[in-house]
Structure formats: C-alpha cells, structure tokens
Amino acid sequence: MGIKVYKPTTNGRRNMTGSDFAEITTSTPEKSLLVSMSKTAGRNNTGRITVRHHGGGHKRKYRMIDFKRTTDNVVAKVATIEYDPNRTANIALIVYANGVKSYILAAKGLEVGMTVVSGPDADIKVGNALPLANIPVGTLIHNIELKPGKGGQLVRSAGASAQVLGSEGKYTLVRLQSGEVRMILSTCRATIGVVGNEQQSLINLGKAGRTRHMGIRPTVRGSVMNPNDHPHGGGEGRQPVGRKSPMTPWGKPALGLKTRNKKAKSSKLIVRRIND
C-alpha cells in the first residue's frame, strides 16, 4: 500500500492523504459473500444510544469473512485482493480446489495467484492457518482464536501482528501488539504473517466530511454541555472541571482507572500486562 498526498487546492485538501489502492485488484465484490447491513446509529433495540458518535455514513454491505479457517487440507488459490469498508485491513477472495469461495484477511505479501491452506500439517507460509502448537517460536501471526473453533478474535486490524514466544503445557505464550503476553490454548488456530495495509494508520483524513462519510459523528466536549449531560458541564462561561480529576460522561474517573473486571477468569492467562 502507498500513501497518496493531495495538492492543497482547498483548505480541506491541505495535508489530506489517502490510500493509492495499488494492492486492490478488483472493485466488484463476490455477491454470494455479501450481506445487507441496516443502520442503527449507535442505538439498541429500545432506541437508546449505546455507542456514541455513530450515525450517517455511506451505505455498506458486509463481507462474510472466514475467521475460522476450518476447511483443512484443501488448497485455495488467491483470486483477488479487495477493499473492505467494514475494517482497516484489505481482504482476499480465495477459491478452494472444490470450487468453494471464501474471504480471508489479506496478509502482507499475499498476492493474486498464491495458494493458501489450513490444517495441522500446513506449511509455515503467509496466509496459512494452523494450530498454535504447530507454529515455531518467533513466528509472526494474526487472526488468533481465544477458543478452539470459535474463529479468530485477536490481531485482525491493518498492520497488526503477534509473536509466538513458546509453549507451556497445553498453552502457547503469545506477545500481542500492545506488548501484553498471554497464554492461549495450543489447539487454537492462527494465521501466519502480518495483516496487510500496514500504512493505513498514516492516512490523514484532512477534513470533517471524510469522517462523516465513515459514519462517525462529532465528539462534543463535556465542558460545553449542561450539568445534567456531563459532570464537566454547567457554569457561567468557561469553567474548570470542578472535580479532583476529569470524569467520563457517566461519572467515573477518566484518567488512570483500570476498567478490567477483577473477577475475569481469563486474568490468570495474562502473563504480562500492557503497563508492566
């Protein structure tokens, strides 16, 4: 992926950058793998806002991604590399030898014409999926399962990767992108390689309109709200927070408070936390 820099023909264009989509090979997705999406604007079934700053944006269709990779020992050929509006990573359309088509995350270095395969006996090659127990120490991986057969949940965004550090009993030690070291069942699957489109984080949207096009609404500061809307709100003119520390809209400390559930059973599987 390359970064395209726009000329400052207007104020909105100044400093704006975008992807050159050099890796994309087609603009027409596979119809059989598309699902219609209805907009919720961040509301739940009762109409209350459960996710703030959502609404509007361009209409999308969901691409059904195969995060499980359970079609073992059947070679698949990469047919296309495509753009996916629902994620930062690109996706690859693969066609199995039996004719079945599927979408997977496009790893860095994966190109049209290459072959991928999944299963315990798969080679250590970009795009192949296999259990953690069969992946050598030091290998970079992505799309990692937390429960065998559930499908990849970790390390799926553009440019992300994790590294296999070793094994301990029935668990495999994996260092995640954040620096956290976690024990994951060795029967869980992962895909070899780094997620592609790694320069996506360098894109400068340049203007508010591109953000709205993505379905993201403005983020309003709490200090300009009313006191019934935010702990920072109210007062005549500009006022300080009025608390010991900044608060979230729901009245909890905004800085430094650990939000992880202390009773979470998976805590014993975390060997090294992010801030240790």
From Swiss-Prot:
Keywords linked to the UniProt accession: Ribonucleoprotein, Ribosomal protein, RNA-binding, rRNA-binding
Annotated signal sequence range: none
GO biological-process terms attached to the record: cytoplasmic translation
Entry GO CC: large ribosomal subunit
Keyword Secreted belongs to the record: no
Family per similarity comment: Belongs to the universal ribosomal protein uL2 family.
Name of this protein: Large ribosomal subunit protein uL2
Organism: Lactococcus lactis subsp. cremoris (strain MG1363)
Lineage: Bacteria, Bacillati, Bacillota, Bacilli, Lactobacillales
